[in-house]
Amino acid sequence: MLNITISGADLEAALEQSKLEGLDISAVEADVHKLSESNLDSSASQNEAFQLLLSMSKLPVNSGYQYDEPAVPEGGSVILDSIATGDTGSTHDLSDHMEGAWLGMCIGIRVASALRNIPRKTAIEALKSASLWPISSLNNSFELASQVYTSNGTTTDMLEMHQQSQCWGAHRITDHALAALSMVEQNGEEFLPVELAKFCKSNFTSAIPANSFDNLLWSGENDNVPPSISPYREDSSALSTSVIWGLIAADNPPRAAQLATANAAISHTKNGLYTCSWLASLAASSCEEMTVPDMITESLAHIPANSRLADVLESVLEWYSLDIDLETAVYRVHELWNEANALHRYHSIPNAMIIAIALIWSGWQFDTALHAAVTSGFDVVGNTAAVCAVVGAHCGREEIGEQWLISGYDNLSTASGSSNMVSLSDAAGRTYNLVQTLRNYAQIR
């Protein structure tokens, strides 16, 4: 059994996810609808729901389905027997790039937090009515937060927490990144991804979200429950925390892709893993001098060629080559995916598309990339954090304008049980040190 109470919404989400994967749902569809509308409070009904989820995890693929998507891509198992070494011959100084990545990540989280779970149309209207279009400074986000929090009846304490300038606030993305650093520093190659997940739960209360997207509850703590049982096996919760693996394996995209895949494999399958591999490889390549379209094209080598993710990323590249503007590109994503649907809003594929669009159309300009990510909808915080981290890694700390900084920009709050504040420059330095160390690793066990 699971460590989570299954709801009717979970069952319906599992059915919709199965459709997205091209599975033949004819044998279970009626049962799912019937059970999802019933009372699931009893242990008997929970067991029935569990068995139904288990049945859905074993459904066959419809004949004629156009994609070929292994649950775990080749070389991406939970234990990696051989990690590709890639090109580790880079001699450029990565220290400023690592600080740029961490700072960008924190700025992205801070700016996007005011628009979390707000529909794109509503967010754009709020920005324009407040004369904050485009978002051009951290002060803009403070003003926006004030309006959003006031209109939503949010407490004064929350508004003050967003506006305070002595540190970057704790968030599960930065906490997960800090936990990843600690695990690799302490254990080197001798750790399992499930240990990282448990380390997060024990030491960083926000590193794994305490809601239905906590996929560890669905699968990671029970060897008898496969990740494929989770309705959220392709959600963006692992995608948004994959950048750190690309930073640790900077200049080595194959290794970054495999590290990210291994980390997410306890809870995600198929495109939930491919997006992690893809984003980590982008982050690993971000310090190199190349155009974003070229970098995106190279990143396709790290995901299955005949997957939904590869298909949509190739479409995004084609849109750019045809001189389609940013707004039209984002609009097309919203035509394909319904942001009002929670499964779609946090699904890894549309969010990977938004990340790719924000990066490609920005041309490595930090301000442009941030604005594109934060105003494109879906998982706004995760996407903006990822985009700003990748662009920050490419540009370096010195290229991030002062208008995005807070007075205590080197202070990062955490939800760690041992320390509630860390130095951003120290986190960047630790990441840089691991880049050097991991070049000597051949295995994760």
Tell me the role of every PLM-derived stretch:
Residues 1-445:
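Structured, active/binding-site neighborhoods that engage oxygen-rich ligands
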